[in-house]
């Protein structure tokens, strides 16, 4: 009788064919969506910018390229007050966009990009389970994966074509590499995550602080080596690209919606909003310094909880960002869920289900109720607050259990000692 391994070796093409069929079906659905729903401006910006450099040798940071992007999006150059749709990522981000920039049909390129982002959301969900050791039951697992793709902070960057989904995957992959001692891989993944530097700057600084406290110098070394190679290789095509990129970064807040809580507060309460923003920055900065010092030389569980807190608080600390980037907060959310089930079992599972439903329905309802239309749906600044506020409260709620060895591990050791 043939073994199962022999059977699989002979009929491996069956699951491969099923996977390919699903991939083609999803891409076809994305293509039809792209045809019927123009947009995906986050992707459009970098698709045009990469093609300009690849086919014309033109810097993606140039005004000429910005006007090309605006014409494709608006049918004309951007008017005062409209989003200028300029390339603001580091030039080495084009590594991600290059395969798609080779496709001249924008709708097809966008459809394939969306398929890749959908794969990224699934991978992020898998990494969340591996990082936290969470083993939800079958029905909760199905809801978990549906939530990962369809919740507001997952589906919106998917539709817009935001590369932040890949940044979240790279961060989660770096955490896994750090836990398993693969420091070289962690450094490389962290370097590539800097394609959206404002999203990862504080988590990367904390990771370096923690790894250096453990004398794990290879993380810093490989991060630096990778960044130097990426920067130098791009300088072969645009020698002064770091200066051009810096100009775009400084220009970015001028044509974007409020990108910090302080900017949001200033719009709501002009008399005191800016001071409130600086006060929030100071409070969060002090908290992070204290938590970083507490995590110094501690084990991975303590480090991981602090990294999740850093990721959440960095969205409010005053660095320019956008609620469209909040998919990076999926991993802290999974940590909270994992601790709840670990501590409270069945009651924890019901709590997880209730919170998922509340987050899913609440964020979408808030977006729909507050949306404005400026040629494309524009989210209200109020979306800066619900998820980070919940996560800060929830992370401190589970802190005691999250930073210590899991209950299952302790019980296993106790049983071993009794033998």
Regions found by a protein language model. Name each.
Residues 11, 95, 140, 193, ...:
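Hydrophobic alpha-helical transmembrane segments of integral membrane proteins
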Residues 189-190, 222-228, 306-312, 349-361:
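Central hydrophobic cores of alpha-helical transmembrane segments
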Residues 195-199, 228-233, 358, 362:
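Membrane-embedded alpha-helical segments of transport systems
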């Amino acid at each position: 009788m043939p073994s199962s391994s022999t059977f699989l070796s002979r009929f491996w093409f069956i699951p491969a064919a099923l996977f390919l069929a699903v991939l083609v079906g999803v891409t076809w659905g994305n293509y039809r969506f792209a045809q019927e729903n123009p947009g995906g401006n986050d992707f459009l910006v970098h698709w045009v910018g990469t093609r300009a450099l690849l086919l014309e040798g033109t810097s993606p940071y140039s005004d000429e390229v910005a006007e090309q992007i605006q014409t494709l999006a608006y049918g004309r150059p951007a008017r005062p007050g409209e989003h200028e749709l300029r390339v603001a990522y580091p030039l080495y981000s084009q590594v991600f966009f290059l395969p798609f920039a080779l496709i001249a049909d924008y709708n097809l390129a966008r459809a394939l990009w969306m398929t890749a982002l959908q794969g990224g959301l699934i991978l992020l969900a898998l990494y969340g389970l591996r990082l936290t050791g969470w083993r939800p039951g079958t029905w909760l697992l199905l809801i978990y994966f549906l939530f990962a793709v369809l919740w507001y902070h997952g589906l919106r960057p998917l539709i817009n074509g935001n590369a932040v989904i890949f940044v979240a995957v790279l961060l989660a992959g770096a955490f896994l590499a750090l836990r398993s001692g693969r420091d070289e891989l962690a450094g490389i993944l962290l370097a590539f995550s800097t394609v959206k530097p404002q999203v990862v700057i504080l988590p990367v600084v904390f990771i370096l602080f923690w790894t250096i406290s453990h004398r794990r110098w290879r993380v810093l070394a490989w991060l630096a080596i990778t960044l130097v190679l990426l920067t130098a290789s791009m300088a072969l095509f645009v020698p002064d690209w770091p200066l051009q990129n810096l100009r775009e970064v400084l220009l970015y807040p001028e044509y974007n919606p409020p990108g910090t809580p302080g900017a949001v507060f200033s719009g709501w309460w002009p008399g005191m909003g800016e001071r409130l923003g600086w006060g929030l920055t100071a409070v969060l900065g002090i908290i992070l310094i204290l938590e970083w010092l507490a995590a110094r030389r501690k084990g991975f569980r303590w480090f991981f909880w602090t990294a999740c807190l850093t990721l959440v608080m960095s969205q409010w600390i005053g660095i320019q960002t956008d609620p469209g980037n909040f998919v990076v907060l999926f991993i802290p959310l999974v940590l909270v869920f994992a601790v709840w089930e670990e501590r409270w079992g069945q009651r924890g599972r019901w709590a997880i289900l209730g919170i998922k439903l509340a987050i899913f329905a609440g964020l979408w309802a808030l977006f729909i109720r507050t949306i404005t239309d400026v040629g494309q749906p524009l989210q209200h600044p109020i979306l800066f607050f619900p998820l980070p506020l919940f996560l800060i409260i929830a992370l401190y709620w589970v802190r005691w259990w999250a930073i210590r060895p899991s209950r299952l591990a302790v019980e296993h050791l106790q049983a071993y000692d009794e033998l």
